[in-house]
């Protein structure tokens, strides 16, 4: 297959279709619905071990701490849920998104910090697992089962998509985690 980076005119939808075709060619027996499991879809044993662990997830205490942060009132009485549609339910799958006003790709974590800032609170460090890590882990559970709904709409968003695509394939030129997907043989 042709290089996706070299195919600069491919739309995000064309890239998505090319990726699906590549994986269906490499793993024809695996249903598309299993792709959500990532590498676990390639090993029944690994998937069974994961499912067993998830019966009593070792991170449940962290989720609980995140919930406490999510529900704790700010000094002004509001909570994180006031910053997100439907209190944060079914929103995480809409990230990241492109904001044309700032010309930035906005992550869920960036909007969590915007919520803190807008409510007069100190923002969390992105690498602080005790705050940002736990609140993000909890907040994402509010979107469990939600399909990913990332959109690339408009010239600015498309430019950011192309930048991300170039970065991804440059970093994965010789890698791809053993999938063989890299600049030299990615879909396109």
Name each model feature, range by range.
Residues 1-3, 188:
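Intrinsic structural disorder
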Residues 3-61, 99-174:
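Post-cleavage N-terminal segment of exported redox proteins
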Residues 40-52, 63, 69, 73-117, ...:
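Gly/Gly-Pro-rich "capping" loops immediately C-terminal to redox-active cysteine motifs
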Residues 66-69, 158-188:
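Conserved small-residue-rich
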């Amino acid at each position: 297959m042709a290089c996706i980076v070299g195919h600069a005119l491919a739309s995000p939808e064309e890239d998505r279709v090319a990726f699906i075709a590549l994986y269906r060619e490499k793993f024809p027996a695996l249903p598309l619905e299993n792709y959500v499991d990532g590498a676990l879809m390639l090993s029944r044993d690994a998937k069974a071990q994961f499912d067993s662990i998830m019966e009593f997830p070792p991170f449940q205490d962290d989720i609980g701490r995140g919930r406490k942060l999510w529900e704790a009132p700010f000094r002004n009485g509001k909570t994180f849920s006031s910053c997100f549609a439907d209190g944060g339910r079914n929103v995480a799958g809409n990230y990241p998104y492109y904001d044309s006003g700032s010309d930035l790709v906005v992550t869920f974590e960036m909007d969590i910090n915007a919520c803190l800032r807008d409510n007069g609170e100190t923002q969390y460090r992105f690498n602080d697992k005790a705050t940002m890590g736990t609140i993000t882990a909890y907040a994402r559970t509010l979107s469990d089962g939600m399909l990913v709904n990332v959109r690339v709409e408009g010239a600015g968003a498309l430019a950011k998509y192309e930048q991300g695509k170039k970065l991804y394939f440059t970093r994965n030129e010789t890698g791809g985690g053993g999938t063989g997907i890299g600049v030299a043989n990615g879909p396109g």
